[in-house]
């Protein structure tokens, strides 16, 4: 198969391939970018594979950076762009089901492609637009099928994260997993416990943000892979609820909303501990737990002005988005009205601060000072007090009166 036109991302990188070939080596576009252009999807990263060894690659170009030279990768700075160029390689026995004990550089494109995870990711493209397909990836692409390269059992024993990648690609590409590949994923799912939580989180997160995320979750359920992921053991019912409780065309607005609703569906009692088990950042934990708290408030009643002040319009909108997807009552107009009615959106908007209370009222730093500032803040938010220096001073004076 030959491309009639090369996408602009590849055209810009063609001089890189030309230089490498003029130096006497082979060079191809490889991986996800080739797959995506054939599927007419947006291209993100342009990856180049070459028969030149790292030191040979560096000798060809003036500006290079060693970003992963032990694995054969050199970053080339050329034509205003950055390109990762990786030497064809084979990988020795894998350690802990996640990383090769040794990487060997080779001159053969086929040897390089045969170590990849799925056939649709094992395609290469030359400078003339000719697709190189050694493992029937084009047929799988046409039939929307995800199939492991070579023996599926070996691919998942080498790196068990490929199981999570399989779920993610099913979700992002809307592909069905080929039977033998699926069975190998199912039988090797216990190996997911050997994978770093951070790597599993990245794949699960991408799955949740994919347009066909239900397909990825359904495959995970069928494989019983969830039993080997943090906080998901014996959570088949909760994951099924996640799939069926939202409208068919619903996709999550952002990562916070997705993970919040996962925990809502699973009825997680301690969201922070759940997210800690996934080794997420403190900021991520803080935002998602607040989002769940606001969702639960909304289950009980309509939003009030204080809710919008404390949680923000954006977070309230994410909650309403989830409610709409469940065919529950939604009131975005109320959120906008309450937000517009707020005199302040943050305590730093208050014209008087702790320093004024210490200087003008002789208050001492400590709990009493903090409590007074909270009273001022609440009174302003609720509309009982103007955000005016003189008015606030009078309010404080009255509060301090014996």
Curated annotation (Swiss-Prot):
Cofactor(s) the record lists: Mg(2+)
Source organism per UniProt: Streptococcus pyogenes serotype M5 (strain Manfredo)
MF annotations from Gene Ontology: ATP binding; CCA tRNA nucleotidyltransferase activity; magnesium ion binding; tRNA binding
CDD domains documented for this protein: NT_ClassII-CCAase
GO terms classed as biological process: RNA repair; tRNA 3'-terminal CCA addition
Summary of subunit composition and partner proteins: Homodimer.
Name of this protein: CCA-adding enzyme
Biological classification of the source: Bacteria, Bacillati, Bacillota, Bacilli, Lactobacillales
Keywords assigned: ATP-binding, Magnesium, Metal-binding, Nucleotide-binding, Nucleotidyltransferase, RNA repair, RNA-binding, Transferase, tRNA processing
Catalytic activity: a tRNA precursor + 2 CTP + ATP = a tRNA with a 3' CCA end + 3 diphosphate; a tRNA with a 3' CCA end + 2 CTP + ATP = a tRNA with a 3' CCACCA end + 3 diphosphate
Gene that encodes it: cca
